[in-house]
Amino acid sequence: MSSRQDKEKSVNVQVLLRCRPFSDDEVRSNAPQVITCNDYQREVAVTQTIAGKQIDRVFTFDKVFGPTAKQRDLYDQAIIPIVNEVLEGFNCTIFAYGQTGTGKTYTMEGECRRAKSGPKGQLPADAGVIPRAVKQIFDTLESQNTEYSVKVTFLELYNEEITDLLAPEEISKAALEERQKKPLPLMEDGKGGVLVRGLEEEIVTNASEIFSLLERGSAKRRTAETLLNKQSSRSHSLFSITIHIKEATPEGEELIKCGKLNLVDLAGSENISRSGAREGRAREAGEINKSLLTLGRVITALVEHLGHVPYRDSKLTRLLRDSLGGRTKTCIIATVSPSVHCLEETLSTLDYAHRAKSIKNRPEVNQKMMKSTLIKDLYGEIDRLKAEVYAAREKVGVYIPKDRYQQEENERKAMADQIEQMTTSLEANQKQINDLQEKYDSELQHSADLSKKLEATEKCLDHTSNLLSTTKEDLKQAQYNLKEKDYIISEQRKAENALIQQACLLRSDLEKSNRENAALYSKIARGDKLNAANRSVVNSFQADLASKLDILSTTLATSIDQQNKHLKSVENLCKSCVDSHDTATSEIKKKILASKALYMSHMEAFQNVVLLHKANSNSTLEDISSLSAASCCSLDQLLACVEGEAQKIFGDIQNLLADHRSEVAHFTQELRESFRISLDRTKDMSSFILGLFDKYVEETSKLQSHSNHTHEAQVKSLEDFQKAYEEQSKSEEQKLLADITSLVSKHVTRQRELVGGRLNSLGDAARGNKAFLDEHTSAMEVVTKDAKRKWEMFAEQAENDCKVGSNFSAAKHCRMETILQECACTVDTAAQQWKASHATVNDLCRKQIAEVEALVRSAIETNEQHEAEIASSRATAEEHASNSSKDLLQDVDNMLQEARNSSSRVVSTVEAHLGESQHLQESHSSHTAGINTHADNAFQSSYKDYEPTGETPVRSEPEVPSKDAIESLRAMPMESLMDEFRENHPYEPSKDRRPSLIPRSPLATINN
């Protein structure tokens, strides 16, 4: 309970923000403005650029004063209520916080001197918080016509050392140096606060004295010029005003009401690199920043409610301990600069000021003291001091150090002044008492005169008293009835408010349900849109795939027809080559047989001539028969030898031609077999490609059927879902009219279950569809890769077959050339042998002629005739042999040329077929790659999965009040409420008291 009361009494620290206008240097440099103040909305916006982006940070304070705000505006709106609270007996603190050069001292002090021309000593427009607060205090005290006393202190905190700015100037220089060496100590007062021992308290009686003291102390403050401020405060200052106001109670007792106002001007935090501080100034800036950093840590600890608050880390925080988290009302004036050059310090000031808003103080009114008690305490203090003085003089007491003795002497001096003041006040009070006694005597005389009149009115008073008692009883009864009615009305209002609150909760739950239904409908619409887009992607992919497959099928069919044509042309070429070879061989055979027959006829004719010559020569050459017989035998042997050689040559030629024919037939057979194998492979490849197309068509039909089936299933599912949702909505709407409380939750739950189940089924169907499409797509990719591999193998095999056929043809061509060369060599050998035989015959003839020249002179004519016939026969035979050899060589050359032409035609046909096969392979590869790319684009880029947007509501169970809870909100009947009120507040009739007959004392005049 006590902690709750403390929380109720706690008050947040009031934080004001003031932004100064641009200085002359900033105006000349055209510095950008980063601070925007909104006085009406109490907001401050800071514009900063981070990573090329402009970011605005907005801070909210209790009051905001822009660059155009005047000193009077700030004081009238924010400081006047604080000064009034000081006059009510509170301790209040006002301090300025911010960077150096932002106008803290100007805000707190301003222009301290009063205007000389004003009839009432009005302050100048630039006067700050301190002079305006002083003027308000004295104006208020003087207007109240009360006795008061005002004391002021003014201290400076420089480098963690406290200096009294109101120390008397007549102190000797040695004493002043000694005091400066020994700064004033800071001590605990035992009540959670601190006090400075030896601090001068100046008693002032009017505002002019305070202004003079303020000017004197401000002149002693340490200031210096920096790059940021021409007159920068190098220390913190604390100006305290303590007010004692005497009040009189109705009982005649006098009380002393005490209030204290602390006005703090903090030194500004500064960046040494920008302020240009060096050596001593840098040390000053370091101490200032250290104390302000400790102040920031204290603010952070108070805001975060840490167990330890570092008050003792700095004398500044020790002095402000009661103002931050204590029993004092605190107001912080944060001052900032609008320039971009001070953006970092401005953000730091705004952050600390914004955090300081969360500090909670527990202000308490200072306890009022009775004047007699205060005088008694002062007398006791005087007696104690006298005893100490006596002990010190008689040397029977405790000795203390010299500095403490001086401090106590100063304190005693102050106490003596206070006692003297109190004595003066006591004499004035005694004089006032005497005056009041005289007035009292005169009033007694006057009351004696009035007593006679009082006796006359007492009789009337008795009657009036009786009437008044009756009226009071009636009034009391009426007031009791009014209280009873008020109690009933309040209870009914409570019940009505509870019912309204419950209805609002139900309405918010219903609105939330409607929003969630809208989100679910939007999600279903997104799913339908995504499915439609995917269906269009699949349909377009199916159409493109069918068109590309048709193109590929047409290309392959054309290629197969071209290959069949090429194979037929090659087969025709082979057949024509074989036929030409057969024709040439038969012609050569005929020519050889004709040559042989001609040769045999010539030989027979020659033999006939020889036999005829022999028969004719028998009669004339009987004497040389032996020699002729020998010559004939030699000639017969020679002819037989020549005939054997000729038969042998003709046999060799026939054997060579037979071998050549068999080799040509074998070559033709092998070439046919090679082309047959190539044709079979082409047919296999064609059948494989046709099967591949059949598989593509089958996969496409499967995809089409599955897509149609999936679409139909989804459409049917959505129709079922729509019907079920409409039916359930109608039934739920009818039921909602009966019992709105319980069925709202059931309605929401059923809708969520129904929508969740349908969405799950749709999600499963979409995932199954995607898996099916992925499976068939992968199958199509496998089939395409297999077809590509088969086609590459086929192309490689066809190329190898072409190379083998070409090599085989070249080898057979070389073999035929070799055989023909051998045949030509054989013919040349036969001709040479024939010439050799002819020469041998001529030699034998010449020998025979030489031997038988004497014997055949008689038959010269006959021999010459026979020789001429033989020569003509020989010439004819030689001519026929030469013509036959030439014809045979010409036929062999023609056959060789025809074989070469046929081989070149076959090679060109095979090369053309190979080029078309390679072109077909490249075209098929490009079409296959295009199909794969299109499939990847269709199923990886265009085909999209459902992506959650985060807008689908999370499933949650609504809080449904029970019937008992709703019934408990119903207001009780009026009779029950009246009985309850009468039971808790029973009516007590007033006792019938008779009016007193004792004469009343006369009234004393309180104020004259």
UniProtKB/Swiss-Prot annotation:
- For this UniProt entry, what is the primary localization, expressed as one broad class? cytoplasm
Q: Which GO terms describe its biological process?
A: microtubule-based movement; mitotic spindle assembly; spindle elongation
Q: Where are the transmembrane segments?
A: none
The family database entries (InterPro entries) matched by this protein are listed as:
KIF11-like, KIF11-like_kin_motor_dom, Kinesin_motor_CS, Kinesin_motor_dom, Kinesin_motor_dom_sf, P-loop_NTPase
Example GO CC term: the record gives: mitotic spindle
- According to the UniProt entry, which residue ranges have a biased composition of type Basic and acidic residues? 913-925, 979-995
Keywords of the record, alphabetical order, are: ATP-binding, Coiled coil, Cytoplasm, Cytoskeleton, Microtubule, Motor protein, Nucleotide-binding
The residues the record assigns to binding ATP are 98-105
Residue limits of the Kinesin motor domain? 12-359
Which ranges of the sequence are coiled-coil? 402-459
Q: Where is this region: Disordered?
A: 910-931, 943-962, 975-1008
What subcellular locations does the record give? Answer: Cytoplasm, Cytoskeleton; Cytoplasm, Cytoskeleton, Spindle
The protein's matches in CDD domains, at most eight in alphabetical order, are given as:
KISc_BimC_Eg5
Q: From what superkingdom does this record's organism come?
A: Eukaryota
- Sorted alphabetically, which Gene3D superfamilies does this protein's record hold? Kinesin motor domain
A GO MF annotation of the entry reads: plus-end-directed microtubule motor activity
User: What's this protein's function?
Assistant: Responsible for microtubule translocation. May be important for the organization of phragmoplast-specific arrays of microtubules. Plays an essential role in stabilizing the mitotic spindle. Required during mitotic cytokinesis.
- Name the family: Belongs to the TRAFAC class myosin-kinesin ATPase superfamily. Kinesin family. KIN-5/BimC subfamily.
Identification of the protein by name: Kinesin-like protein KIN-5C
Organism per entry: Oryza sativa subsp. japonica (Rice)
